[in-house]
Amino acid sequence: MVYFKKIAAVGKYHDDQAIPDVIAYITRKDKTPSRIILGYHVDMLDIANCMIEVSKHFGKYSRIRLHHFILTFRPVDASLIPLIAHEICAYIGRTYQVVAAQHEDTPNPHLHIVFNAVSYVNGYRYRGGKEDYYELIDRMNSIIYAHGLHPLIPVKYRANINNPHE
């Protein structure tokens, strides 16, 4: 069982510090002791600036700067996280710069995935509407299912928010 949560709030991720702050958070050493961090179409030593440069190149360094979601796994499924992260990032990375980091600072390991709101391919913004959302969920479900796990459960459907695996 894998739980999905999109991090979104009114006004969140709109300011100039959004990309550097989120990248710094998801790649923190205390959160990622195994250092399972991967990225597509970014310099792993300068992730935030790579994303900012693409947005500025296309004249779109305004409004929402990035998209961020979390996949939470059962501890027994932790060994699958790097494989799943790679496949999800390969899918998103066809069009957007993307970074994933496995956090191990809670009983249930979880994967943070962050991608630039502006495409490095054509400069278009990720719209993030219902159609985009469900297309992404469907692709992630097919990846997760291929690894023998049950499809994603969006966080709003969780019975117990404090322990998603009850």
Can you annotate each of these PLM segments?
Residues M1-E166:
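N-terminal nicking endonuclease/strand-transfer module with a His-rich metal-binding environment
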